[in-house]
Amino acid sequence: MSLLRRWFDPIRSTWYYDRPLREAQLPIDDGITVYLRLDDVYSYLAVQQLEQLEEILVDELKPLKIVISDQAAPPPNGMSVDIWQNYCLNDAKILALQHRFAYDDVPEMPSKEAIQQAHLILERTPLKDRDFLYLLEDVFHMLWNQQYGKLKMLYAMAKNYQMPPQDIQFRFESIPILTAYFAFGGREYQAVDDLLRLTRRLQQQKLLKSSPIFLINHIEWREHLITDAEELFEIQSLQPELDLYIALEDPISWLLVSYIKDELANLYNIHLQIHPLPYQGRDHFDWSLATRLSKRTDVEFTPFCRPDVKTAMIMAQVFFQLGKEAQEEALLDMLKLTWTKGKDLSYTPHLQPILDEYHIQTLKLTPEDIEQKLQDNAVHCEQLQQPNLPVMVLRIAGQQFVFNSLYRVWMIESIFSNILEQRYKQQAHDLDMEREQ
């Protein structure tokens, strides 16, 4: 690691963390713009929130500006288009069930013909303001619920309309969009995952006329769904297992592993298994995102010294040299030194306390051995077909659930709650059957 990073990262990171997290005011001159795609399932979820959001905005931010793009950005993480679309459909179904969005029981991508018809309907409509938002939601609903008969009726009517004059509220553009997002004050907010962050910002700047009520079943960090002692015991007795595929150089790995260990694993008796991946280049990360996550999870962060390729390899060497029972604790210790003490573990004096604590005299495994183990983990992770890291695999009650990233950690508790509900329903059903006999 360069001396520049070793010496200046701890200083810079401490200063960054201690400064005020939020700018006092974001500019409102450009209002709020919502970027959508007709063939993006997250856009379908987003439009179901727009009328309610517009209703509580102050007049200075009205109307919401809508941009619909006909161009999809390349799928993330090298995923194929088909795999990415399938992932999005399944992920959106999970979000819809959690937050009570309207959503088809058997979701599928809308046809190209239907998308073209929806495009013309929106392009030719004379509707404005809230009436336009109602139409927008209806059109998306027809698209994503295969109500093609209704769509064709609107299409037949729209063909007879003249093209309306250009409207500041709505336009089509050909710009690459991966998934729906809001743009406000020079920042981007994912349309579903960052909606509450956006409304908190708007509320802070007194840009809402009333309190927002969105995503009513959202599970906050450090909030637990299961607090009843009997229910806790039932989940604990199922001995859930959680596999985590992480990049060693990523601060999100430290923040989430520490959070899951302290807040969830101990509470629910989750057996953790950590699988380090080859270097992913994630030492070049969004400092503001990591800082926000640290403060919301209450996990210690900074001063840090970002690991590079060499440091990640040394951490992996220590990890794989230990038995499975010691790997998790050793990795947490190394991550803690890196992300809360500003230690450079490629520098022997900084690494030595770890070697001493775990009685490691020499690092015996060769770089080739380590690379092979990391690559094996990477192959397994790739087979799970997830767009972001960390990738999480939860096994409980004979079922397996795969999800990813800081935006889906809440699923752990949601799954536990659903498992209990399923078991209680089954027990009630069995009891009814016994009574009938």
Regions found by a protein language model. Give the residues of each.
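Active-site beta-loop-alpha junctions enriched in small/polar residues
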Residues: D39, E249, L277
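A eukaryotic "domain-start" boundary segment
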Residues: I11-S13, Y17, R22
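Asp/Glu-centered strand-loop micro-motifs enriched in Gly/Pro and often flanked by an aromatic residue
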Residues: A24-L26
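Aromatic-acidic/polar surface patches that form glycan- and anion
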Residues: D39, E188, D308
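Structural alpha/beta surface segment adjacent to cysteine/selenocysteine redox centers
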Residues: L45-L143, W254-K341, R423, Q427-E436
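C-terminal cap of thioredoxin/glutaredoxin-like
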Residues: L3-W7, I11-R12, I28-V34, S43-E55, ...
